[in-house]
């Protein structure tokens, strides 16, 4: 039956005799079989018996079977098939219930899966599934490790903004290093497409009264401020409906700040939040209440109430140039380190700052006594790390009330990143990373914000929100640990190493990131000279004390005996977004690009 179906699909392509490598690749695509060209090329070479660069229909069938008929899938199929040829709908339902932990399962659902994935018409009409169909199902999105429920916004989005982790970028305009690299609109577009909700804009006076964006006092190139916000306007809500915060690093004169205010209002129109929401006069609004809104984060003159009362009056009337105004209106005069040059705030720009007023962090005690609900702090990673070790309870209390942004230290001229996990552990909402720099920190960032539909907002765990909680990530005294078991079964079409001596020698590392006690990793043995279908069949167990903060990272490396192991691909996701059962893990490159069909095949089980 399968042979008849197979021949009916391919025989027309062999009417002219043999086919070459390119036609082989196209025929596999026609059959909906995903295979990377580099692996097809090698398998083609191995099965071209006459070594003429052309293969027969029988040789193509051998290639097809090598690619699609994986031993580990056949073993599962045979376990549930009564005759090792087909699965009845009841057999499939049993598999989904017992192995895939399907909460709701019936023959009707099994019928739907059969209709969707079974390619052989007569088998499909009989409400049965062949190995061909089962293989296609196991290779589908429905069997990915990442839960379908987490692909949509499922969390309560009506909490105040300070109750969420918010995807945030640092120096968003840069696509390289911070001294000589180019400033590029792609930095903003790329970040927004990835779900970033807080963008940094470094603003300076430009020629012809046009503010520019670049890394000040460096040789990085410049962008017009109005061009930057036009790009943001175009892409702001392409990935997520929830609010975007524009974090202004404002070095402009009052005259060019007024130009900035005009540009913001002209570009964003009604999307720009320029006054308090009626329902939130003294608390931060929720992401839900701020859908499709742009928020400006900057220094501000006076209070929200004063701004609200001033609305409708001439916003160009007073730029607060007089030094005597400083006592009445805090934030008018700023000093940069030991320099005496003061920066004045244009009232027109100040009035656009509503719920995200930038306020210098002084101390936790000062914040408790004086900080207003709409005031946000930005703290450098070095100071934040020191505070998190010496005053962790105060830090967590602070992040329960106020939006806190953590940014990379100034010495990271190469745009490198810190590990964001240590600051998520204490509830910091905006942990700002250099999105242009690939590596472990961005893998964690991308993995964490896969959750909640990639919306860029993730509700913090209750113990980082509730005032009665005494959570300390370094001293876990209570909670409900999870025992996570992962059987790493096999790899599927893994990338090849660049080494000429050990191509195809691969291993997998499984890492856990979370509170300090949960940080751990384990790795498989090396499989030699088989990147196409390595079989490990190794089982690993992890005890995870705070699963709400845990991320799991799978890393595939090529063994390197002299220069060290070579990174080949990775996948990171929140522990609580992992499906149980037999699952496929897609791999991504260091730059975050999909390496499909390269993937891992695992069996996952966990209990709390």
Curated annotation (Swiss-Prot):
A family per Pfam: C2
Keywords: Calcium, Cytoplasm, Developmental protein, Disease variant, Fertilization, Hydrolase, Lipid degradation, Lipid metabolism, Nucleus, Transducer
Tissue specificity note: Expressed specifically in testis and sperm. Weakly expressed in pancreatic-duct cells. Up-regulated in pancreatic-duct cells from patients with cystic fibrosis.
Localization, UniProt: Nucleus; Cytoplasm, Perinuclear region
GO cellular component terms listed in the entry, alphabetical order: cytosol; nucleolus; nucleoplasm; nucleus; perinuclear region of cytoplasm; pronucleus; sperm head
Protein name: 1-phosphatidylinositol 4,5-bisphosphate phosphodiesterase zeta-1
Organism: Homo sapiens (Human)
InterPro entries named among the record's database cross-references: C2_dom (IPR000008), C2_domain_sf (IPR035892), EF-hand-dom_pair (IPR011992), EF_hand_dom (IPR002048), PI-PLC_fam (IPR001192), PLC-like_Pdiesterase_TIM-brl (IPR017946), PLC_EF-hand-like (IPR015359), PLipase_C_PInositol-sp_X_dom (IPR000909)
Outcome when changing residue 425 to S: In SPGF17; uncertain significance
This protein's record includes keyword DNA-binding: no
